[in-house]
Amino acid sequence: MKSASVIKNIFSLVALLLLHCLASTAARAQTPQFIPFSAAQPILNAYLGSLPAELKPGGQPTAAAWDKWVRDQDKDIRVRIEQGEENTLTNLLRLGVTYTKEPRIDYEYLAKYGHSSFVDNIADKRTNDLVRALTAPHLNEGMLEMKALLEKKGYSLKTPDDQKNVKAYLLANLARLRDDVDRDRQQAKNNKYQAFKDRGISTDSNLYPDYTIDLHLRHMMQEGLLKPGSIHRVAIVGPGLDFVNKKSGSDFYPPQTTQPFAVIDTLARLGLADPEKMELYTFDISSRVNKHLERARREAVAGKPYTIQLLASPSDGWSKSYLSGFLEFWQKLGKEVGKSTTPIPVPDEASDIWNRAINVRPSVVRRVTPIDMNVVFQSVTLPSDKQFDLVIGTNIFVYYDSLDQSLARANIGRMIRPGGFLLTNEALPNKAPSNLVDSLKTSVPITSDPPLTDYMYSYLRK
């Protein structure tokens, strides 16, 4: 018994040392730096007429003005992450099913909030139920994160008056989200790829962009743009953290990140990469996302798999081709990176959600390294043999305006090897110079009435 205990302790020590070495190596190799003025100047010159006054104090951009502006903007964007987390809390109020039996507040009901006594009554009851749930002694992971957000904002749940204040805050956020959604719809009429440029940056995610990535990679292979075994290093911008996502999410499962492992799975299934040898980095400015991935890596070093609930909400409005294609993707997802496991049962109140689950192998989880980096204003300097074959960003650039998107396009391009690609489901402006050129567009029709189509774009590094 004693020798078994010693062996166990030695194994634990080796695992900790391995994790420390992995983390130290990653930290040394991946230190984000703000873009120098020399790199930003060509982009700034392309937008000279519309630049903020503080960037061109004498009519032209200056290095000193840039250095101050870029750091101020980075701080502002990180504040928008916290605003996005407030939206996650509001989506928990709208769509959660673990703490209430009241109907969910979908977008149709959300638009009526404040104008319909029926919806107002639902919102009031859901808020009472959520506040009551947040005061419970043993909270699940998602609830704990939302309670921590409230405390970070200065709220308490200790007394009845404290709880009244939290209720007022939650309902005010519900009204704000209603107005944000309406404004976003109006902005999308002008440019749908910048529809969220004035709202909090959400970390929520779902599987649908991962299916579009799968289709686009197939298209690239058909066009001869990608060869078998050609992908070794990948970066994902804003991998997301799925917990009550804004469209059809719920709260009966813990927060999880799916895109890194869905991408590895697709690359392996298509023969483009070896899941046990490739490297994948995530670039995110959300501490929730980064800490979540760091914890997954620590647990993987100790031999624990990463469990993902593969949630989907098929719609009767989907075209037959989209429905059959997505379901085939959904049923295969995870076979290259892990194995099926027992899913969390879907509550009756969320019966529109389908679920299956996988355990991702620890060896695959260890291939993922999170980096705290704002790709609009920061980058890492990479030697040629460490540049990326693919950088992927979905549902992220929609939170930025044209100048920010152009800075990101040029910035990301410097981290991609010649012949590599940036993939995104948002068309990026080509007004400013970059070393990325438009390459391929994939159209994915989803519905016909009303017409709805997803797109994926690839940009080739010259």
Q: Which residue ranges define each predicted feature?
A:
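A short SAM/SAH-binding and catalytic strip from SAM-dependent methyltransferases
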Residues: 388-403
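A short acidic, Gly/Pro-enriched loop at the edge of an enzyme's catalytic core
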Residues: 229, 377-391
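Conserved beta-strand signature within the Rossmann-like core of class I S-adenosyl-L-methionine
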Residues: 418-427
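Conserved Class I S-adenosyl-L-methionine
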Residues: 304-315, 326-330, 433-461
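Conserved alpha-helix/loop element of class I SAM-dependent methyltransferases that forms part
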Residues: 207-233, 259-262
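Class I S-adenosyl-L-methionine-dependent methyltransferase module
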Residues: 35, 39-186, 228, 240-372, ...
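Bacterial N-terminal signal peptides
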Residues: 12-23
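A short glycine-rich, Lys/Arg-flanked "PGG" loop and its adjoining helix->strand segment in the class I
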Residues: 271, 406-418
